[in-house]
Amino acid sequence: MADKKNLLLLFDHPTEPVFMDKGKRVTVFDVPDSFLTDRYRPISNEVQSRVGDKVEQRVPVREISIPDLRIPMSLGRDEQFSLFLPKHRRIAGRLIDIFMNMRSVDDLQSVAVYARDRVNPVLFNYALSVALLHRPDTQGLDLPSFSQTFPDRFIDSQVIRKMREESFVVQPGSRMPITIPRDYTASDLDPEHRLWYFREDLGINLHHWHWHLVYPFEASDRSIVAKDRRGELFYYMHQQVIARYNAERFSNNLARVLPFNNLRDPIAEGYFPKMDSLVASRAWPPRFESTRLSDLNRESDQLNVEIGDLERWRDRIYEAIHQGFVMDERGNRVPLDEATGIDTLGNMIESSILSPNRVLYGDLHNNGHTFISYAHDPTSKHLESFGVMGDVSTAMRDPVFYKWHSYIDRIFQEHKSRLPAYTENQLNYPGVSIAGIQVDTNGGRPNNLTTFWQQSDVDMSRGFDFLPRGNVFARFTHLQHLPFTYTISLNNDSGAQRFGYVRIFMAPKNDERGQPMLMRDQRSMMIELDKFVTSLNPGPNTIRRRSTESSVTIPFERTFRNLDANRPAAGTPEELEFNFCGCGWPNHMLVPKGLPEGLQCVLFIMVSNYENDRIDQQLVGRCSDAASYCGVRDRLYPDRQSMGFPFDRLPRSGVDRLVNFLTPNMSIVDVNIRHENRTVQRPN
């Protein structure tokens, strides 16, 4: 019986042959000769004996008849792989099916070992990751962080070269971390570059990659895609990214991001990633300023789409929103109601295989990524691959990602603006009132938050192929804040014990011109900081909650988890949950950067009636940690209200400011976020 943990070794050193040593314990797969590629079959004994001296563990691989891999092998090993391309999606779907349909872990190991040296390394990583997440007999395996396996997606090529040099020349115990420069993609002449720390943050890009891994939009096994409220989660997670990005823009004296409304306008911003793909051995193509989109006709990618197609799909989606229903493939009306409308729209706009009618409403969001990522070579005349917008692990580095998603969010907001506003009765919690709220950092002034820079080291050795083994560290600079605590004083006058759902949001107080924000603008800038259940005793209550407990974020250790060092004990419920926990907003980016003189924000806290919000289900283990943006593994989303409640709809009539929106179970307080331009080293 194969040990399922050995499957994780197949992620190590993705471009090396499968029979090379892997893992911290020097482990080798005993690959049957018939599984080797033509290049290595004649010399396998020689190579394996060379590796064999140091081996601590051997993994037997059973020889079985291999399913038809022609479709997965149709993508070259040195091509770029993108989930946004329909051809690549079909190829990935086929490989996922093959991995999912293997009867046992033994058979899965055999097929994975056979496929590993024959299919594209990034495709292999994606398909095996999805299969391990969804197969009942492999759930609970901790997938290695994508940044460790493919460091080239996160680090510029100069640093990669220095890391190669370090690992080749210096013995493992003496190696020094290689510092990633802070300003390597542009200079301050480009105002957009002020946001480098957000767009190029390793944790944020890993969150986006991991979210799409947990919520794939295509697979022939529908259950892999059809998770609870995944369309709504697509809307909400990306809406929150835009709200957070806009708060960062205010923290750098920039206006809110403008949506990419007219697809025929030039894209003002250029982007030069300065990264090389180790799989394709090519540089990621840049996009020059004022590039226009063109119709795509790339035979090699089986792509033939016109800008007119995107415009038609957009118009049909708007028409459906204004009519209040969409037409499914059988001609039936599917209502866009308060309960499920946003979920239907999310699957339709993204689009996933759950879309009610892909023929009519198309594939707007995914194709937008494709159009932008091929803007530099729309007909494949220069044989160039896609830019960073074509890959979920790199897309958030590009300023145009936020313009495109603001445009997508505007379509969702059109639907939300047509729903009836929440009434005071829907918002109020009779008998429960908040007396006061305060935020404190250790030893700081009340209601003042502080951010600064921090340098952290991440081990990238799994992704460095054809080099001596041992740790290779990259040191990167990221935003960090002093931890803080919310203190909420509230009264329960109902005379009995009650349960409340505490919802914490924050938004800038003033707009770009320094004017107090109107409620209808401010609601779309609200970033969710936390959401948790609390019991309310009769009479006065004081609730304290630490910022590190947030339902939005995961701790640093989990974003960059070292799978060997801090793995929970084998077989425990905690271990089962460890992997899903890779999805979540990085805790170091919980609050915006702020300004040296302080960014004026308003903190909003609401306690809603948990009886109305509760979902009856068991949540074992710790993986509801980042449920707000990621949901909970194999469970329903743990909140009955719409995502973003109470700010997901326009306010009731007569409410033009946040203060008029409040009911007794809500409270606001002004908070100041100061940025100190100092850099501290993260304690190891």
From Swiss-Prot:
Assigned keywords, A-Z: Copper, Disulfide bond, Glycoprotein, Melanin biosynthesis, Metal-binding, Monooxygenase, Oxidoreductase, Secreted, Zymogen
Paired cysteines (S-S): C581-C623, C583-C630
Recorded superkingdom: Eukaryota
Annotated glycan sites: N448, N492, N665, N677
GO molecular function, one term: tyrosinase activity
Entry-linked InterPro entries: Di-copper_centre_dom_sf, Hemocyanin/hexamerin, Hemocyanin/hexamerin_mid_dom, Hemocyanin_C, Hemocyanin_C_sf, Hemocyanin_N, Hemocyanin_N_sf, Ig_E-set
Binding site for Cu cation A: H208, H212, H238
Catalytic residues (UniProt): E350
Name of the featured protein: Phenoloxidase 2
